[in-house]
């Protein structure tokens, strides 16, 4: 498993992480098997959020890890906070309470990383800074980052937050590429030229923030998986051809397509199927060619200027 450095820190992480949102729907034995499979494949980074399964996903992780004999020093734990029923909340009180809840559910004394989940337009940067300072000083959080945030929202936080913001977790897949499309269509007037995200890809590279790619196999906003989907015949034919050339599955190739980008991203995969997880892990060391990357991009329906 290839490892990268998270943002500007010295923290070494695998370039594939396990997203734990679906753990809540598994039995303890099933979850224990998934966690052990991930570790055996070199995936020791686990992504959580306080809202996943209403907190049940974090509880299941702790129970499954205990059953599998997995100790705290074997894993890197990330959680996210800021989403509440019907609104977003980056207040100091909520951030700290959320972390306290995650620590209890995960049965740990600290998180390796904490991300602010979705932008809160009522965010007061001073409150975020105070929360981060308290969590860092108490040893409850080692590193910090954001999720789904525009570069200017990151800059607003950085105006008061002392700690480096190491990551931005963003939706990215072969079938969801707005952060890439805009860069190809500078000085154009058609839809792909619109900067929906403030050139977050280039910003992240300049700031040395690690992009964590979520929903790497989805199209739309949780509309479904594009791999082996009859709705995308050209894309899947291309994936099957290139995957066969490399001796990997189309799913692994879809992850490798993201990892080929020189931004040195981390892919968050959510599979709870042990065999599929082992399969996806083969993407870690796979480096496709520039020509193959562009062929896949075009097969997804994208046109180059």
Protein language model features and the residues they cover:
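N-terminal binding-site loop/beta-alpha segment at the start of enzyme catalytic domains
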Residues: 1-75, 137, 218
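Beta/alpha (TIM)-barrel catalytic core signal, keyed to glycine-rich beta->alpha loops juxtaposed to Asp/Glu
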Residues: 125-305
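Short, acidic/polar
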Residues: 27-38, 90-105, 152-155
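Active-site groove signature of glycoside hydrolases
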Residues: 103-124
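A short, structured active-site edge motif that brings together acidic residues
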Residues: 73-85, 169-174
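Conserved beta-strand positions
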Residues: 18, 48, 79, 113-116, ...
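A structural motif
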Residues: 43, 108-111, 141, 165
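Active-site mouth loops of central-metabolism enzymes
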Residues: 19-29, 81-93
């Amino acid at each position: 498993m290839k490892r990268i450095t998270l943002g500007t820190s010295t923290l070494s992480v695998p370039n594939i992480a396990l997203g734990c949102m679906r753990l809540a729907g598994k039995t303890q034995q099933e979850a224990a098997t998934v966690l052990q499979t991930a570790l055996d494949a070199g995936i020791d980074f686990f992504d959580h959020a306080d809202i996943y399964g209403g907190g049940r996903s974090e509880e299941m992780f702790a129970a499954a890890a205990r059953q599998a004999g997995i100790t705290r020093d074997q894993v890197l734990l990330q959680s996210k906070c800021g989403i509440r029923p019907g609104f977003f909340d980056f207040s100091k009180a909520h951030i700290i309470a959320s972390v306290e809840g995650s620590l209890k559910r995960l049965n740990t004394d600290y998180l390796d990383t904490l991300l602010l989940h979705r932008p809160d337009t009522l965010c007061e940067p001073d409150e975020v800074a105070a929360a981060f300072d308290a969590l860092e000083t108490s040893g409850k959080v080692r590193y910090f980052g954001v999720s789904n945030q525009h570069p200017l929202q990151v800059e607003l936080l950085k105006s008061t937050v002392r700690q480096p913001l190491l990551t931005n977790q963003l939706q990215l897949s072969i079938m969801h590429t707005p952060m890439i499309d805009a860069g190809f269509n500078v000085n154009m007037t058609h839809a792909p030229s619109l900067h929906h995200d403030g050139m977050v890809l280039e910003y992240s590279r300049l700031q040395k923030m690690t992009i964590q790619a979520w929903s790497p196999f989805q199209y739309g906003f949780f509309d479904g998986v594009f791999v082996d989907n009859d709705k995308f015949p050209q894309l899947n034919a291309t994936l099957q051809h290139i995957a066969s050339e490399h001796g990997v599955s189309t799913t692994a190739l879809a992850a490798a397509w993201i990892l080929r980008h020189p931004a040195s991203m981390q892919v968050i995969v959510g599979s709870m199927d042990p065999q599929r997880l082992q399969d996806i892990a083969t993407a870690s060391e796979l480096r496709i060619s520039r020509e193959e990357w562009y062929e896949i991009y075009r097969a997804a329906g994208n046109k180059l200027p």
